[in-house]
Amino acid sequence: MRWLLAYVMLLGAAHAQQPQNPSPMVEHTRAHPRLKEETPPGRRENLDLGTLFLPAHSRAIFFFFHGGTWLPEVAASRNKVAVVSVQAGAGSATYARLFDDPRRFLRLLAEAEAKAGVKFDRVMLGGWSAGCGAVRQILKTPESYARVDAALLIDGMHTDYVDGKPGPLESEIDPGNLAIWLQLARDAIAGRKRLIVTHSEIFPGTYASTTETADYLVAQLGLRRRAVLKWGPMGTQQLSEARAGKFRLLGYAGNSAPDHVDQLHALLVLLKWLR
């Protein structure tokens, strides 16, 4: 019996000393379909930050970060909303710095409304991957938070590890960067806002994964994930879901770069759900 106990302890120690490897860049099981690049009809205006696209009869506006230009325009055109597309480089900190001036977002919205010649009746924010850093920074300003009706976080809700690295079992993550998402989720559950969060199974290794942050959010909200197994938009495979009120969290299979990009190309459908 003693040798068995010693073996189990040794096995546990060995596993604790082996960090999980970062996620791969390739995946060959799923099809990973992609939207075809196109230029939908509509008016385009350069703004102080980003490009405004105005399809006909658009009364809602969507600010989207880190998705290029044509893809958000295609999604906006199909959903009949205006979109401001912003591409600013790599890393969530790069996008957060765009809104270090807490008044910048409302100025940008006012500029978009002036060029559109309309006061938008619905304001939505969205980001993919690093772009979620801009959304977080915007919402930290109470005046901007009050003006925003809905937000979409596509596989980009990250934070740091408390000790700077993942734990051997369940990691301890820094809740600081997640506080605004928790506030927004509670408002969505109460019906005051709408929030959609998606995540993959990607493990960055140097900061908390979107799976870990999603687990934290669900736990803090007192919700339970429901295990599902079904096809999602653009060939994604949905594994889990949690929802309450106007809050919705969806977990998708995949821990590779193509799986990450799949969710960006699902923007057309995700924006429809956000409306």
Regions found by a protein language model. Give the residues of each.
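The feature captures the conserved acid-bearing segment of alpha/beta-hydrolase catalytic domains
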Residues: 152-260
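Catalytic active-site module of serine/aspartate enzymes centered on a nucleophile-bearing elbow/loop
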Residues: 253, 260-275
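Conserved hydrolase catalytic core segment
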Residues: 137-149
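Sec-dependent signal peptide recognition
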Residues: 1-7
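Alpha/beta-hydrolase fold nucleophile elbow
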Residues: 117-129
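Active-site machinery of serine-nucleophile hydrolases
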Residues: 56-116, 235-239, 247
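A domain-start/cap signature at the N-terminus of enzymes
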Residues: 16-61, 235-237, 245, 275
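Glycine-rich nucleophile elbow surrounding the catalytic serine of serine-hydrolase chemistry
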Residues: 127-137
